[in-house]
Amino acid sequence: MASLKSIIRQGKQTRSDLKQLRNSGKVPAVVYGYGTKNTSVKVDEVEFIKVIREVGRNGVIDLGVGSKTIKVMVSDYQFDPLKNQITHIDFLAINMSEERTVEVQVQLVGEAVGAKEGGVVEQPLFNLEVTATPENIPETIEVDISELQVNDSLAVSDIKISGDFTIENNPEDSIVTVVPPTDEPSEEEVEAMEGESATEEPEVVGEDKEDDEEENKED
């Protein structure tokens, strides 16, 4: 479990104050949830990133708030891609004995046999809904695809659970499948198609109409 220090933000801050705060390398944040009142804090952005890399997106953090240490998870955060900067964080204070349902990333492991034969690995499901107490939430769920042939697939029910957690998704939901390769036309077929399109006479717009008008004049 990683630790992170925070500093309580006093009073109401203007947009200019928050901009100055972010420019100094700090991120405005709020702490709320189990056993605590809503508290506005700020944390060091670099230190926060280090902690998340250590514990993962759903990891538990010992957050120092004033004279207390609160066990929290990151409930939400906002990121500015233009400035490459985290702009706000929501820390949720948690009860370690209470189960929570969160999204956990699926990580494919190995290279499918079917992919080596030209098949294409498709992954329709990238995250799974997992219920567990905070310390039992996995960082990722690994799915071994090394034995998959072309037209093989794996569903949620095929996952071998190696921890104290429950997957909430429909057991029949497909996680990964190996589809047959798409047949691409050969060079000869491409040249033949191009030749056919070149020999087709373009339709002259209005030609039929002019012929009808000439026939009417003769009548």
Swiss-Prot record:
Domain of life: Bacteria
Any one GO CC term of the record: cytosolic large ribosomal subunit
Compositionally skewed regions (Acidic residues) per UniProt: 184-219
PANTHER family: RIBOSOMAL PROTEIN L25/GLN-TRNA SYNTHETASE, ANTI-CODON-BINDING DOMAIN-CONTAINING PROTEIN, RIBOSOMAL PROTEIN L25_GLN-TRNA SYNTHETASE, ANTI-CODON-BINDING DOMAIN-CONTAINING PROTEIN
Function: This is one of the proteins that binds to the 5S RNA in the ribosome where it forms part of the central protuberance.
Complex and partners: Part of the 50S ribosomal subunit; part of the 5S rRNA/L5/L18/L25 subcomplex. Contacts the 5S rRNA. Binds to the 5S rRNA independently of L5 and L18.
Record family assignment: Belongs to the bacterial ribosomal protein bL25 family. CTC subfamily.
Protein's recorded name: Large ribosomal subunit protein bL25
Gene coding for it: rplY
